């Protein structure tokens, strides 16, 4: 259904902000305003009485990779770099059979200029990034980040949380969401939140992200569609997201001799 919809908002829920060591507790998808689904991920446990029917992480990753690799499907995230690092760091957990299947899901080569925009399409929706073939399959073939879009539309927004989903949901959408601090008490993590509360919070994040994208994209088309420089800036920001993510995951090589020379 998400593939058929053509665009879907995605959000990860983890037990910490460390994208390498954190546990992927679940994820949310939303492709229709006001309707979202939260998918809890099964956690490894030695307790036979603590097993659940939740989807296993490797199977969840495989299905998400299939969604992300679908040609023409826009995946929308808020602060995408976090979600991308969480998912990319788990690609190695796929079985050989799943890895072989993923190899057959082609994302395709990027169009000229690495952009999906054309002379007739200068909206934010037309400037998503087509990932190059070398990009890991857990990177969407077409990606938009509402946090970056909000920043480009208003780079002078004040406050350290001025681009948070919570703040933008209130100021742009007029929607008040569930407070994270109301769910997770001091000394706890999201893993301690009961499922009936976790799914409401997670699904709400994905729903807000989709609605925010539509609202910001409409504003972008109104204010920036006749400004080629703005279009190029958005295109560039979307292009570098996967690159920066890979750099932060794997590091970069520095020629210390050249730097000290």
Predicted features and spans:
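Extended, well-ordered alpha-helical scaffold/bundle regions in very large, multi-domain proteins
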Residues: 232-261
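Short acidic, Gly/Ser-rich segments with clustered Asp/Glu that frequently serve as metal-coordination loops
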Residues: 7-8, 12-20
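Short loop/turn and capping residues at structural boundaries
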Residues: 12-13, 79, 181, 258
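Active-site-proximal helix-loop-helix substrate-binding element of RNase H-like nuclease domains
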Residues: 18, 22-105, 136-224, 234-236, ...
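Short glycine/serine/threonine-biased micro-segments
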Residues: 14, 24-26, 249
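Intrinsic disorder/low-complexity segments
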Residues: 94-138
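A short, flexible low-complexity segment enriched in Lys/Arg and Gly/Pro that occurs
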Residues: 227-231
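N- or domain-start disorder-to-order transition segments that initiate the globular core
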Residues: 1-6
């Amino acid at each position: 259904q998400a593939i058929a919809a053509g665009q879907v908002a995605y959000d990860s829920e983890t037990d910490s902000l460390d994208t390498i060591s954190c546990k992927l507790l679940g994820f949310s998808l939303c492709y229709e305003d006001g309707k979202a689904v939260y998918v809890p991920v099964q956690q490894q446990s030695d307790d036979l009485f603590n097993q659940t029917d939740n989807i296993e992480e490797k199977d969840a990753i495989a299905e998400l990779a299939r969604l992300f690799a679908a040609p023409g499907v826009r995946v929308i995230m808020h602060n995408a770099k976090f979600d991308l690092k969480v998912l990319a760091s788990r690609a190695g957990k796929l079985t050989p059979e799943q890895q072989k299947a993923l190899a057959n899901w082609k994302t395709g080569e990027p169009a000229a200029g690495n952009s999906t925009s054309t002379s007739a399409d200068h909206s934010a929706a037309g400037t998503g990034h087509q990932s190059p073939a070398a990009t890991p399959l857990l990177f969407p073939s077409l990606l938009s980040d509402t946090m970056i879009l909000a920043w480009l539309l208003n780079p002078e927004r004040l406050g350290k949380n001025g681009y948070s989903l919570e703040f933008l949901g209130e100021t742009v959408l007029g929607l008040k969401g569930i407070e994270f601090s109301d769910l997770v008490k001091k000394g706890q993590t999201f893993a301690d939140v009961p499922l009936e509360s976790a799914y409401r919070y997670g699904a709400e994040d994905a729903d807000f992200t989709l609605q925010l994208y539509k609202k910001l994209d409409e504003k972008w088309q109104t204010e920036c569609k006749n400004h080629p420089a703005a279009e190029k800036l958005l295109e560039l920001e979307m292009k570098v997201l996967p690159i920066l993510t890979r750099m932060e995951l794997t590091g970069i090589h520095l020629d210390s001799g050249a730097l000290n020379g």
